[in-house]
Regions:
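Accessory terminal regions of nucleic-acid processing enzymes
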Residues: 1-130
């Protein structure tokens, strides 16, 4: 709370796509359930997603969306009750969560682009990145 009003969560991803490490250029909708779940679990209002690579990094701001978190909770509750056979309602909620994930991913804001730099290690010996 003293560092960031409303609390702050930091999630770090190290993407390795196509055999090459490269930072994300945007927040992907498929990340949204995890990111919003972290915000819900911690009660924080903001999450900074750091996408790191040895060639540079990006930082994105993701804000909590209580409606989305509620829909996720409803979908999870339906999965838990799946034996009751309410697949139609689960399908509706699943589609709603996927659609909202796209909206929230687009709303996420890139707050920093960090250029590559020399590897700095607090450990003795060579740097692990090379």
């Amino acid at each position: 709370e003293q560092v960031w009003p409303g609390g702050l969560v930091v999630e770090v991803k190290c993407p390795f796509r196509g055999g090459q490490p490269a930072p994300h250029v945007k927040v992907l909708p498929r990340m949204m359930p995890q990111l919003q779940g972290q915000l819900l679990a911690t009660g924080a209002a903001t999450l900074h997603l750091v996408s790191w690579s040895p060639y540079g990094s990006t930082v994105f701001r993701v804000t909590a969306d209580l409606d989305y978190q509620r829909e996720m909770g409803e979908a999870l509750a339906l999965v838990a009750r799946q034996a009751t056979g309410d697949g139609e309602e689960l399908g509706r909620l699943s589609r709603a969560v996927r659609e909202r994930s796209v909206v929230l991913a687009k709303r996420s804001e890139r707050v920093a682009l960090i250029p590559p730099s020399e590897c700095v290690s607090v450990y003795d010996g060579p740097c692990a990145v090379g």
